[in-house]
Structures are given as structure tokens and as C-alpha cells.
Design a protein with these regions (language model features):
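Catalytic binding pocket for nucleotide-activated donors in carbohydrate/polymer assembly enzymes
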Residues: 134, 143-225
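Short acidic loop-to-helix transition motifs that present clustered carboxylates
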Residues: 124-128, 147-148
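Active-site-proximal region of nucleotide-activated glycan assembly enzymes
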Residues: 1-43
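A short, aliphatic-rich alpha-helical micro-motif
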Residues: 3, 131-134
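Conserved catalytic-core segment of nucleotide-activated headgroup transferases in glycan assembly
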Residues: 33-126, 133-135
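C-terminal amphipathic helix plus adjacent low-complexity
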Residues: 64-66, 82, 86, 90-107, ...
Length: 246
């Protein structure tokens, strides 16, 4: 149980799979497609494909909260960086994050990563500038065991697919559910070794990744991820079922 005073839990079939209901004291409310939906940002920047084309170095990126960058994540990311001619872009989600940035660099140094391969940016104050950061890299790397949610929605909206890890519970499967709803199962790794192998595969096929840009945005906009009207209707129907059952 998450909380003793919570009766229902909103989920989908990708987050809590059949047979796992017994692990929850709450009554599970399964949404038809996905447990969450995002409204299209008002100031959605253009996708700049030229940045990726002009980059001589393949660039990975993650705009997730630094707290989600686990020791396991750093080890796998370091392995990727140490075995490719690539770099990694990270961005803080809080102000005055110098100590956090220093701590991150130290963790990568312990894995023998050249610090010049990592760029860590400060928080930006408006959404448009934040979203424009996705134009700086080729592929988003998701964190694990706790993946990004909003940043994953943002990534595909900005034409950048994200590589995520298959989880073993609700919280660790959010990226999996998002990619399944987009039909991007190839971007779901089964374990740390598969994550590494997939990252190398996409690194070697950078042209394919770059070409996904505008098409991926349109696909996301027409998927359950951004269909807030359909999600609202489904959510209302679920609430009405709960109300009428009492």
C-alpha cells in the first residue's frame, strides 16, 4: 500500500501487470491506454535537426532530476561514454546546484570518464528554453530504477526518442508504458547490459535517430500521451464507476 487512507490507485496494464494486483491494498483503476497524459506545451519550440547534423560528436542527454541519477545509472552511462566517441548533456532542475554538479562529476570520474565528455547546465527559468535543450543532443538516456516522466513526454515532443529500462514495479515502469504507447518497444532495455548494447546500436545508427525528429513529434501529439480530452473522458468514466459503486 502507498498510504493507508488511499482507496484507489490509477494505473495502466504496463505499470501493474496481470497477477500483481495482490501486492496492492488499493483498488486498482486501470486506464485504457496510459495512466497519465500531458497537455501540449504552449510555447513548443521548433525541432532543430541541423544541430544534430552539425554535431561531429554523437551526444546523449538527460534532463531528469539529478536525484534520479542512481549509482547504477552512472555505471551504465559511464560504460557507454568510455566505449564511444560521444558526450553527455545534463541539466539541473534546481537553482544553485554547484554542489550537486560537483558531486556528479566526481561520480563519473570514479568510473574513469573524461570530464570533457560531460556538460552540466544550470536550471533555466522558462519552459521554452528548457525544451530547447532537447535540440542539443541526439538521444535521451532515461534514468533507472526511477525513470523520468515529464522529461520523457518532453523528449518525444521534441523529436528525441528515449532509451529506458524495463522495471519491476509501478514507479520503475513509467518509461516502459510511455514507449509502449508510442510503439517504440525497441527503446526499452531488459537489463543493464541490454541498455548498454542498445545505446551503442543507436549511436552507430545516428542517421536513423536524427530522422525521427518531426515524425516522432507528430506521432506523440496523436498518441494517448497527449490526448488529454480522451484521457479526461476516460478518467471521468472511471470516477463515475467508483461513485456509482458506493
Amino acid at each position: 500500500a502507498l498510504r493507508s487512507n488511499m482507496d484507489y490507485l490509477i494505473t495502466d496494464e504496463n505499470l501493474i501487470k496481470k497477477g500483481e494486483e495482490k501486492f496492492y491494498s488499493e483498488k486498482l483503476i486501470y486506464m485504457p491506454d496510459i495512466w497519465n497524459s500531458l497537455s501540449k506545451p504552449k510555447n513548443l519550440p521548433e525541432i532543430d535537426l541541423n544541430i544534430c547534423k552539425n554535431n561531429k560528436t554523437f551526444t546523449f542527454g538527460s534532463l531528469s532530476n539529478f536525484q534520479k541519477i542512481s549509482v547504477e545509472t552512472i555505471k551504465v552511462w559511464s560504460n557507454i561514454l568510455n566505449n564511444t566517441n560521444s558526450k553527455l548533456i545534463l541539466k539541473s532542475s534546481i537553482n544553485n546546484s554547484n554542489d550537486l554538479k560537483k558531486n556528479l562529476y566526481e561520480k563519473f570520474l570514479k568510473e574513469n570518464v573524461n570530464p570533457e565528455k560531460i556538460e552540466v547546465f544550470d536550471r533555466v527559468e522558462n519552459q521554452k528554453n528548457h525544451l530547447e535543450f532537447y535540440n542539443k543532443f541526439n538521444l535521451t538516456l532515461d534514468t533507472f530504477p526511477y525513470p523520468g516522466v515529464t522529461t520523457s513526454f518532453e523528449s518525444v515532443l521534441m523529436g528525441k526518442p528515449f532509451l529506458t529500462m524495463r522495471g519491476n514495479n509501478f514507479n520503475s515502469r513509467c518509461g516502459e508504458s510511455i514507449n509502449i504507447n508510442l510503439g517504440l518497444k525497441d527503446f526499452i532495455a531488459t537489463d543493464e547490459n541490454d541498455y548498454y548494447e542498445k545505446a551503442l546500436k543507436f549511436y552507430k545508427d545516428s542517421n536513423k535517430i536524427s530522422k525521427m525528429g518531426q515524425q516522432l513529434r507528430e506521432h506523440a501529439l496523436n498518441s494517448p500521451l497527449l490526448d488529454v480530452k480522451k484521457f479526461s473522458k476516460n478518467f471521468y468514466d472511471k470516477l463515475y464507476e467508483i461513485y456509482t459503486s458506493h
